[in-house]
C-alpha cells in the first residue's frame, strides 16, 4: 500500500528531479528536445494531482493530453515549427507495434502507464492546427477520448499484463488493462526501469540518464491521415502525471470496416446510395473519400479497395454520395 507523507509542493519540486517522456514513436516532446527548444523533456509534469490510486480521476488542465513543460513554457498541445505539423510514423490498422518511453534515473516514481488513440477526428484536429491552442475544456475532452480509446495491454496476444505490485485488490488502480511498472521499493529491477532492465543511458534524459521502458500495443481498426497517439504515466510515489503525444498516420482500417459492411450490413441506411454501385468503384486500387461541408470538400480518408470487396452485393451506406468517392 502507498504510505502517506506530509510534504509541501515546493519541497517536492526542490527534492525530486527528472522523470520521463515518450520516445518511440518520436513524441512532440522528443522533437522539441532534439530541436534544442526543450532543455528537459522528462520535465513535462501535471502536478500536484491525485495520480494514485485512481489513475483516471485527475483533470489534465493546462497540460492537456500532449503535455505542457513549465520549465521552457512550451505547450505541446499546439503544433510548433519542429513538431505536430506532419506525421512521424505510419501504422496500419491491426498492426502490433513497439512503443517506448524513457524514465530518468533520478525520477523513477513507479506506477502505471497507458497509451490511447482518440477516434474523434474533429476533436483531434484542434491539436493539429499550428494557429490554434485548444482550451482546457477541449484538452480534457480529448483526454477523455484517449482514455475511451485505450490501447489495452491484453490486446496483444501473449503479452504479460500484470497488476501493479504497489496496488491492492479492491483499489481503483487494481487493473491490468494498463501497463505496470515493477514494485517501487523492490531490491532489484525496481520501478519503471525494471520493466526492460536496460542499461543506464539506454535512452537520453538531461538529469541523471535514462532507462528504456518498452511495450507493445495493437493499432485499432481506424484510419486517419494524421492523428495522435497519447502516452500517460501515473506516478505511484508522487502526485504527478506525465502526458505526451506522437503524430502517426493510420492506414487500412476502412478496408476492414467496408468488408464488415458488405458481409453484415451493419452500417447506417441511406436508400439513395449503395456500396460498389452508386460509388462507382472501377476495380482494385486506392480511392479517396470526401465529406462535403457547405459545398467544400474535406478529405476524410483513403479507401484501399481490393478484389475481395468488389464482387459482394451492394448495400446502402449513410452520408455518402456518388461525388464523395474519387479514384486516385
From Swiss-Prot:
Disulfide bonds: 40-43, 66-245, 102-203, 118-145, 153-161, 167-173, 181-192
Disruption phenotype: Impairs degradation of resistant potato starch, but has limited impact on less-resistant wheat starch and no impact on processed solubilized starch.
Keyword GTP-binding attributed: no
GO cellular component terms attached to this protein's record: extracellular region
Main subcellular localisation: secreted
Summary of the protein's practical applications: Starch-active PMOs provide an expanded perspective on studies of starch metabolism and may have potential in the food and starch-based biofuel industries.
Signal sequence interval, chain numbering: 1-18
Reactions catalysed, as given in the entry: starch + reduced acceptor + O2 = D-glucono-1,5-lactone-terminated malto-oligosaccharides + short-chain malto-oligosaccharides + acceptor + H2O
Residues with glycosylation annotation: 54, 306
Keyword Secreted (UniProt): yes
Residue sites binding Cu(2+) per the record: 19, 109, 242
EC primary class: oxidoreductase
Residue ranges of the TM segments: none
Family designation: Belongs to the polysaccharide monooxygenase AA13 family.
Function: Lytic polysaccharide monooxygenase involved in breakdown of granular resistant starch.
Protein name: Lytic polysaccharide monooxygenase aasB
Species the sequence originates in: Emericella nidulans (strain FGSC A4 / ATCC 38163 / CBS 112.46 / NRRL 194 / M139)
